[in-house]
């Protein structure tokens, strides 16, 4: 147990048998007003906002699966989702982590049961998958190690469902400074990986960055990466604009 004497964030390092692990830890203040003001006014709003999408129904994602963690769960089960991005297939698990991909200790929920990711993608019949994973690994594991596990997941999906198009979404920043720096480094690895392999790369994270590179207070519900309704609406707009750009 760690006892906080004041609000803020720090790092904890543990070592055992020659192995060292470091993680970021935050302690938020009690009220929402205190939380909103803790990091100062420069953290209130994002540096960029997406343009207003063109009106009309969006069906681009109706044949897509969305692979992710609890943040993706927020996206897919928020009121207004169908009007914003249609009816994608949810392939997620709360607290999802790519660390559990190589040994199948982490799988996704599909049709009310636990499936290996690649088998769920193949069985779902989707033509494309949108993937945002890695946030729960960063802060515990390095961007490079997280990326290696991400590649393993993609390799398995391509082997099992080679016809499916891969869309990689950049991972959202955190309210924690060190984790946001790790996330930025991880996103750069994903961006280059997508370019090298002709995958699609969807720039989501840049619309969720305050001037200090962290998640804006107005978008963060918990000081990390879980979203407020305002943040979810922003993500909807990013995806709507992306769909419209692909259909032009």
Give the location of each predicted region.
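A structural signal for isolated positions on well-ordered beta-strands in alpha/beta enzyme cores
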Residues: 65, 130, 165-167, 200
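Conserved SGNH/GDSL esterase-like catalytic core that processes O-acyl groups on lipids
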Residues: 54-145
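Active-site segments of SGNH/GDSL-like serine hydrolases
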Residues: 155-185
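Charged helix-capping and loop-helix junction motifs
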Residues: 144-153, 182-187
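N-terminal secretory targeting modules
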Residues: 25-67, 71-77, 246-247
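Extracytoplasmic soluble-region selector
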Residues: 1-38
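Catalytic His-Asp segment of secreted/periplasmic serine-dependent ester chemistry enzymes
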Residues: 174-248
């Amino acid at each position: 147990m760690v006892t906080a004497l004041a609000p803020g964030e720090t790092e904890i390092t543990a070592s055992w048998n020659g192995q060292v692990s470091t993680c970021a830890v935050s302690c938020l203040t009690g009220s929402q007003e205190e939380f909103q003001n803790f990091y100062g006014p420069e953290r209130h709003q994002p540096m960029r906002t997406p343009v207003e999408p063109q009106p009309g129904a969006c069906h681009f994602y109706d044949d897509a699966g969305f692979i992710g963690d609890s943040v993706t769960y927020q996206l897919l089960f928020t009121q207004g989702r169908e009007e914003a991005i249609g009816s994608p297939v949810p392939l997620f698990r709360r607290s999802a982590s790519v660390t559990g991909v190589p040994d199948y200790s982490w799988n996704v929920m599909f049709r009310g049961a636990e499936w290996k990711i690649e088998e769920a993608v193949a069985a779902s019949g989707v033509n494309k998958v949108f993937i945002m994973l890695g946030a729960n690994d960063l802060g515990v594991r390095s961007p490079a190690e997280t990326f290696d596990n991400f590649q393993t997941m993609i390799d398995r999906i391509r082997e099992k469902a080679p016809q499916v198009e891969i869309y990689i979404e950049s991972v959202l920043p955190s309210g924690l400074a060190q984790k946001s720096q790790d996330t930025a480094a991880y996103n750069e690895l994903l961006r280059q990986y997508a370019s090298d392999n002709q995958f699609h790369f969807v720039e989501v994270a840049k619309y969720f960055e305050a001037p200090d590179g962290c998640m804006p207070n107005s978008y963060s519900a918990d000081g990390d990466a879980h979203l407020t309704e305002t943040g979810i609406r922003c993500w909807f707009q990013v995806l709507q604009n992306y769909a419209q750009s692909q259909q032009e």
